[in-house]
Amino acid sequence: MSKPAAAASHDGVNRAKPYQLMLFPLNNGATNVYFVLILSYVAQFGSSILKLGMFASIMVTVMRIADAVTDPIIGALMDRTSTRIGKFRPFMILGSAVMAISVIILYCLLPLIPESMMALRYISFTLVYFIWVLGYTFQTSCTRAGQTVLTNDPSQRPLFTIFNTIGSLLGMGVMQFMIPLVKAGFDVKDEAGVLISSGYANPELYRIITPIGIAISVLLTALAIIGIAEKDRPEYYGIGGKDQKKVKFSEYAQILKENKPMQRLMVAGAGCKLALAIATNTTVLLALYGIVMGNYNSLYLPMMVLGYVFAVPFFLLSVRTSQKKGQKASLTRYVSIALICYVGVLALLLFSQNGNPARMLSFPFEGGSGINLYTILFILCFGIGYGAYYATADMPIPMVADCSDYETYRSGKYIPGIMGTMFSLVDKLVSSLAQTLVAFIFLL
């Protein structure tokens, strides 16, 4: 064993340096940029710009059938990869490059195909989106699998949630904040200020947000590569740098069948991701703030900031709970709080009544008489619910590394790649399912 490995595992624990804990989670922020750029807007883009109707929404879900084949193959390939720059960094670099090129083609070049060649639009959209999905799998799988080499210290892994959230704010948060601002500049209104055409129907919007999103993602990817560089070496592959048994393709199904913790984690992670995908869906937010509350441009950003403010104390509480009682206990506790509060939000929305000031949101800056009891209750339920949920939304990610470590202890096999891609598969399935669910709900 090399000196670095020996130093890291002299007491049986592989610990990460502070800068490694802070930088590597930015890989998730890098992919979350595309989560917003693609999964939140591709359906609207396909419908309003490419004129594909519901095809884009349905294709996002249907294509997951192919993922059931490609994801395990990518995971198995990762488990067998060992290059001069490590096991994980090649997939991070390749994934980032593939996604960047795919998004440029999708948002900037496909609209140039004339409407007289609609068949080519359908084929090109399907092909480009499929290639983008492969790149997304390459990079997202590293977020899960790479933690096995970064640290196996139970007191350090929960910290991933905090640093991951910082990365998400630098990626997903910036995109969620920036895109509506850019979109507002492309809104077409009449002299009375009534919206005639949404900025989301203007192809120029996508040509502006594409290079911005790519630049943010590439920067976060580069920082994440720096974070894992020292640990992406053979002596850190597995528990304590032990030699690992080779795994045959035929063995993967049996391994996953016997790894009960991983099965339960995939179910929990699917629920968290589905809730996030629906709650942050563009169509849902437009309906909530624009139709139900009547002022999307004035309410969207303040409510988003409110949620982040409430999330701060929950991040600290969830990490503390994870370190004391384990990540499972922390996830269960704070998701339960979020569920109760969101039920309260639903009840308040059902109770609201247009024309009745006591049963509507009222803010002084919107011409209201002041903040009423209904508004206070809504802010508390929404803020606490969003804060508790957001603090645990990515908690299943470090738990994938725990499941991989469990498999190494159980069978002696080190397969972080297949663990990461299986979780990524579920992640993409439910994210895409959210698009289809939202589309069908609004059709009813």
Regions found by a protein language model. Give the residues of each.
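Membrane-embedded alpha-helical bundles of multi-pass transporters/translocases
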Residues: S2-L444
